[in-house]
């Protein structure tokens, strides 16, 4: 059964005395955590037509104590990332794991996410927000505390991580939108994780891509965090080797060494691989622990001897004893989630700021609808009440429905593809429920995808010469809003269902064409084959077109017309003069259906993304 972090958080806190950590200063010593792992084995799962399994980790053991900054090092493919994922219980899809991970002597699984933070290598933010705004919203999601306490925590973190100079700058997107620097983005990643004041912090290559000065600055920050009693486990680069308290070298899925940096230099000298003068120790060590492509046999033999030497060493024996004698102590409680309404409010604020600060999309949609309203109104200017005018008026009504459908559906599809990685990360960090995000994003787009359609109807309405009583105008606007929301909800569903926008569009093009065909303009739907005819009731184009046509002609009073002429106008499309209310109900049903389907698709997609 999928792991629900938010539900588990409530269960976790129920077992411990309530402790308010929201007001605790970050510089104060936190609840100490000792992490141990013993005999960790990880293999790929057997596939249906293959019995081969790849061994990623083989009986790996280790320990990380409070106040220690532990570095996982090794060549590419050594098992560093796999071990990190095992300790965090993340990204284990398709893998089989054996062995135990303990925190303070207690066996632990996915609940470790409740007492730890994870600063990932890839920085993903909302680029339109400032650093201060982003941290305040993150604090609202991570802390059950009042606004004053959250403000103090954010100010403290900004000062600690030296983000004062960029607190009011927009985050931006590297290479696209000017914003904060790479070093500031890396520190912002740590700032988000520190908001909940965790005792255990994981970091994935925190200095990768930074210059030597910025890398040293980040490591010094990590060192300060470790000095306050936190346990830090991360994958570093090799430049700052001697800054770490403990080094764990991995090779071929096994532990080749665990100890202090100075002990590693002595260890490799003792096993026959002394580090030459003027050589960088970590680079030399990693060269000896790497499998060289053109000399694999000799490389594996050398690595095997180093691992064997380590397993027989006193350093290894001491670590095994240390792992097994750790006393069981109380685990720290995790800060309680602020709740559904608080997190939805925070996400709604974030989404609205993002929409407001992306004026290009708003401007283009409004301009598009104004231009199309003027174009359709000019094309069908003041149609007379004769047979030709009736046909032209019906065509104008259909083109209004088509414009509300196609531009809206394809316009909404682009938002999910770029935002999903951030949402998946935050969800798996336990910051919110999927429904909270979905509601907030839907509400943030609602005004934009409502006003523009109504504006187009208002512009073109009197230009075409439609029935202009206030009741008819209001009914037409209602139909336009519901048609646009139908297209919005369908586009949102497809964006949530498919991994890329191109796939969603590839499906939407024939689907929208079918909906348009079933509208009634291109043929009397009652004359369609029975196996196709039923599909008209799934088409919002059909409901919308009928609603506008019925609204236009059911109340027209022209003394030159035959008494039955109005009914003939409707009958050619298989429309009924009493169906306006049914059309509104049908459109509302489609809107509700696609919004619910979109939520289910997004929920499944995010849950499976771990």
From Swiss-Prot:
Main location: membrane
Cell division found in the keyword field: no
The keyword Transferase appears for this protein: no
Cellular component per GO, a single term: plasma membrane
GO molecular function, one term: ATPase-coupled transmembrane transporter activity
Residues covered by the ABC transporter domain: 42-277
Ligand binding (ATP): 74-81
Coiled-coil regions, chain positions: none
Keywords recorded for this protein, A-Z: ATP-binding, Membrane, Nucleotide-binding, Transmembrane, Transmembrane helix, Transport
Membrane topology: Multi-pass membrane protein
Taxonomic superkingdom: Eukaryota
Alphabetical list of PANTHER family matching this protein: ABC TRANSPORTER ATP-BINDING PROTEIN_PERMEASE WHT-3 (PTHR48041:SF31), ABC TRANSPORTER G FAMILY MEMBER 28 (PTHR48041)
The protein's role, per its UniProt record: Required for efficient RNA interference (RNAi) of pop-1 indicating a role in the germline development.
Family (UniProt): Belongs to the ABC transporter superfamily. ABCG family. Eye pigment precursor importer (TC 3.A.1.204) subfamily.
Protein name: ABC transporter ATP-binding protein/permease wht-3
Organism from which the protein derives: Caenorhabditis elegans
């Amino acid at each position: 059964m999928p792991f629900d972090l938010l539900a588990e958080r409530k269960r976790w806190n129920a077992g411990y005395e309530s402790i308010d950590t929201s007001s605790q200063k970050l510089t104060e010593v936190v609840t100490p955590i000792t992490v141990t792992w013993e005999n960790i084995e990880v293999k790929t799962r057997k596939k249906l037509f293959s019995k081969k399994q790849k061994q990623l980790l083989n009986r790996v053991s280790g320990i990380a104590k409070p106040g220690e900054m532990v570095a996982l090092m090794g060549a590419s493919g050594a098992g560093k990332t796999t071990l990190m994922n095992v300790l965090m219980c993340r990204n284990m899809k398709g893998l089989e794991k054996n062995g135990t991970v303990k925190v303070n002597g207690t066996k632990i699984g996915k609940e470790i996410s409740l007492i730890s933070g994870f600063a990932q290598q890839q920085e993903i933010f909302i680029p339109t927000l400032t650093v201060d705004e982003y941290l305040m919203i993150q604090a609202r999601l991570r802390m059950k505390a009042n606004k004053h306490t959250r403000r103090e925590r954010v100010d403290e973190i900004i000062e600690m991580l030296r983000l004062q100079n960029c607190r009011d700058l927009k985050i931006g997107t590297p290479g696209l939108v000017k914003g904060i620097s790479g070093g500031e983005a890396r520190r912002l990643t740590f700032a988000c994780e520190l908001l909940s004041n965790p005792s255990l912090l994981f970091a994935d290559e925190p200095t990768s891509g930074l210059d030597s000065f910025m890398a040293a600055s980040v490591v010094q920050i990590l060192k300060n965090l470790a000095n306050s009693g936190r346990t830090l486990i991360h994958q570093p680069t090799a430049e700052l080797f001697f800054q770490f308290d403990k080094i764990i070298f991995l090779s071929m899925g096994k532990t080749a060494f665990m100890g202090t940096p100075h002990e590693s230099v002595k260890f490799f000298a003792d096993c026959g691989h002394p580090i030459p003068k003027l050589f960088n120790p970590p680079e030399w060590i990693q060269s000896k622990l790497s499998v060289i492509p053109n000399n694999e046999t000799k490389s594996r033999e050398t690595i095997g001897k180093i691992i064997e030497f380590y397993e027989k060493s006193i350093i290894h024996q001491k670590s095994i004893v240390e792992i097994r004698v750790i006393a069981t102590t109380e685990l720290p409680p995790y800060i309680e989630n602020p709740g559904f309404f608080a997190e939805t409010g925070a996400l709604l604020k974030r989404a609205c700021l993002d929409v407001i600060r992306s004026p290009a999309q708003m401007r283009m949609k409004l301009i598009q609808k104004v231009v199309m309203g003027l174009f359709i109104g000019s094309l069908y200017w003041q149609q007379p009440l004769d047979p030709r005018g009736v046909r032209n008026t019906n065509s104008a009504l259909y083109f209004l429905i088509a414009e509300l459908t196609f531009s809206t559906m394809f316009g909404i599809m682009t938002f999910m593809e770029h935002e999903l990685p951030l949402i998946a990360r935050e969800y798996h960090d336990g910051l919110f429920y999927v429904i909270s995000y979905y509601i907030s994003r839907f509400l943030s787009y609602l005004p934009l995808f409502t006003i523009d359609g109504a504006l187009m109807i208002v512009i073109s309405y009197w230009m075409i010469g439609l029935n202009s009583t206030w009741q008819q105008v209001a009914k037409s606007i209602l139909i336009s809003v519901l048609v646009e929301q139908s297209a919005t909800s369908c586009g949102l569903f497809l964006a949530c269902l498919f991994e890329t926008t191109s796939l969603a569009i590839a499906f939407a093009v024939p689907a929208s064409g079918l909906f348009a065909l079933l509208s009634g303009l291109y043929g009397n739907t009652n004359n369609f084959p029975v196996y196709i005819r039923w599909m008209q009731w799934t088409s919002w184009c059909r409901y919308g077109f009928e609603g506008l046509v019925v609204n236009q002609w059911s109340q027209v009073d022209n003394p030159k017309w035959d008494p039955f002429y109005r009914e003939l106008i409707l009958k050619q499309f298989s429309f009924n003069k009493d169906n306006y209310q049914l059309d509104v109900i049908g459109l509302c049903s489609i809107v509700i259906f696609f919004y619910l389907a979109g939520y289910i698709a997004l929920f499944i997609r995010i849950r499976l993304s771990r």
